[in-house]
Design a protein with these regions (language model features):
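Short, polar/acidic, helix-capping and beta-turn segments at strand->helix junctions
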Residues: 1-115
Length: 115
């Protein structure tokens, strides 16, 4: 889908991702009904946007995770730990209604790459 925003932006040595969701390359939500699958795709998208800004997961300072149902926290957390296995970033996780009813998780990240 096309929305009026940038998937990522850079400034002051920082890389900001917009909220990433479980869209695949065709713009379709993947893993409908499966928070683990959606978390994997969402984080894959985060990593891709970070790379476009010159950052890696090792540069991430902070993530914000939005869950359609906070009861999915543990499942999301298990997938998150696979991407950030050591020295994970600061993180806030909240329950929120997401843009489309099939979306279960959204993640945004801030990374530092220097000036």
């Amino acid at each position: 889908p096309t929305y009026p925003y940038s998937p990522g932006a850079t400034g002051g040595g920082l890389v900001f991702t917009a909220g990433q969701v479980a869209w695949d390359e065709t713009g379709e939500v993947t893993g409908v009904g499966d928070v683990a699958a959606q978390t994997r795709q969402t984080l894959k998208n985060v990593v891709s946007v970070l790379a476009e800004g010159g950052a890696t997961v090792n540069d991430v300072l902070k993530c914000t995770v939005y869950l359609a149902d906070i009861r999915d926290f543990q499942t999301m957390n298990e997938e998150f730990a696979k991407v950030f296995p050591t020295d994970p970033p600061a993180r806030t996780t909240v329950e929120a209604r997401l843009a489309e009813p099939t979306m279960l998780v959204e993640v945004e990240a801030v990374a530092y790459v220097g000036s």
